[in-house]
Regions:
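Class I S-adenosyl-L-methionine-dependent methyltransferase catalytic core
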Residues: 1-184
Length: 184
């Protein structure tokens, strides 16, 4: 697994041993970032269930302003990958339960232009992930939440003010894009 383009192009990322982490495939990541286009530039990024950090580090490599990477178990790998890409200065790594850290970020008044959520497939609680982001008002105005889930998992059409805007399937993965519903 590697960073596809940008300032850290070609940098190989370390993955944890075993099969507890399922990083987003390079091909899927490439398609995702092609769809996101220029919205990544200068974005404040939140990566929930960050694993290897591939999504946030790819965003930083492509010009995102900053990223918060959250995972319960891969803190050391996130730090190593941020250092490998020379993007550690823009990457804030938080170790802990994703829902608890999301609540902390909300209490701090933090908002993000782009939120990646990549929980384990068959985690069965994608609605909870979306509700945590919506309840904490973590998504900035005009922001986008990108949820990766298993292709066979049920799609959540809405959670709080977040509404499904579009979805795409890539092999065993489905990428769902959510934005805040327009008011008025």
């Amino acid at each position: 697994m590697r960073i596809i383009t940008g300032s850290a192009r070609g940098t190989r990322l370390k993955s944890p041993a075993g099969d507890g982490t399922r990083p987003t495939a390079d091909r899927t990541r490439e398609a995702l970032f092609s769809m996101l286009g220029s919205r990544v530039v200068d974005a404040r990024v939140l990566d929930l269930f960050a694993g290897t950090g591939a999504l946030a580090l790819e965003a930083l490599s492509r010009g995102a302003a900053s990223a918060v990477l959250v995972d319960r178990t891969t803190h050391a790998i996130l730090a190593e990958n941020a250092a490998r890409t020379k993007l550690a200065g823009c990457a804030e790594i938080r170790r802990g339960d994703v829902y608890a850290v999301a609540a902390e970020l909300a209490r701090e008044g933090r908002t993000f232009d782009l939120i990646f959520a990549d929980p384990p497939y068959a985690h069965g609680d994608n609605a909870r992930v979306l509700e945590a982001a919506a309840r904490g008002a973590l998504l900035a105005a005009g922001g986008l939440l990108v949820l990766e889930q298993g292709a066979g998992e049920e799609i959540v059409p809405q959670a709080g003010a977040l509404r499904l805007m579009r979805e795409r399937r890539y092999g065993a993965a489905r990428i769902c894009f959510y934005a805040e519903e327009e008011q008025g």
